[in-house]
């Protein structure tokens, strides 16, 4: 294993920090968005069947997860606030936004990053409500499917999930960009059958890029962007 700044981890690649493994997704406002590589644990989104993350029981588990990371060296300086947009499927913003150190991806974020997020072995929850009781200030609030949240199936598809049902928790976090994390060094693993010469060349690009004096805020190209740039 070797250590590099988390902002230098290619999107879609796995890194280790604070005793856990994550997949780098994006560089946003000076922070690196990442998701836990695998499901952490299973629990209801909310034991009362309410799809509002601001009051949902799942937040207690997410707080516990961050506390566990802190036992392994994390802090509020290295794991910044994840402010989630709780916009419902129809675009209503009755629930507003909600911030936690360890949060969940939204449906919109999953749609953006799904191609680089590893599949999990079970369903896992997203932060996005299926719909909310009073979108647009209705005079008669509805309870129809307001117990539903979006979730991701083990094959990568996504759909409706009852908030009271047990589902996987896969925390999403924003890391300080200069945080040192560990990645697997090329010399420590044998090439797998699925690795092509092109991907090996990409790994060399990452290795060289990591050793350069880069400007704060820069990150390496994703594999797809690197391929496209190479072909131009």
Map each language-model feature to its residues.
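Acidic, low-complexity, intrinsically disordered interaction modules
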Residues: 189-232
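Collagenous Gly-X-Y triple-helix signature in extracellular proteins
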Residues: 1-187
């Amino acid at each position: 294993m070797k250590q590099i700044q988390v902002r230098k981890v290619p999107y879609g690649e796995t890194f280790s920090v604070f005793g856990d493994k994550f997949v780098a997704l994006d560089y946003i406002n000076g922070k690196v968005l990442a998701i836990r590589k695998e499901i952490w644990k299973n629990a209801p989104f909310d034991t009362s069947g309410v799809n509002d993350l601001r009051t949902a029981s799942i937040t207690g588990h997410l707080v516990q997860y961050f506390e566990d990371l802190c036992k392994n060296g994390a802090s509020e300086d290295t794991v910044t606030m994840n402010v989630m947009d709780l916009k419902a499927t129809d675009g209503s913003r009755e629930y507003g936004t909600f911030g936690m150190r360890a949060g969940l991806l939204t449906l919109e974020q999953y749609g953006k990053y799904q191609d680089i997020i590893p599949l999990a072995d079970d369903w896992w929850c997203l932060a996005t409500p299926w719909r909310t009781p009073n979108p647009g200030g209705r005079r008669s609030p509805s309870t129809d499917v307001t117990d539903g949240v979006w979730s991701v199936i083990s094959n990568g598809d996504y759909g409706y999930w009852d908030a009271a049902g047990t589902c996987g928790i896969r925390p999403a976090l924003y890391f300080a960009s200069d945080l040192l994390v560990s990645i697997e060094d090329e010399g420590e693993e044998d090439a797998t059958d699925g690795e092509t010469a092109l991907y090996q060349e990409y790994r060399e690009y990452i290795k060289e890029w990591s050793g350069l004096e880069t400007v704060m805020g820069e990150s390496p190209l994703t594999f797809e962007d690197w391929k496209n740039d190479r072909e131009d």
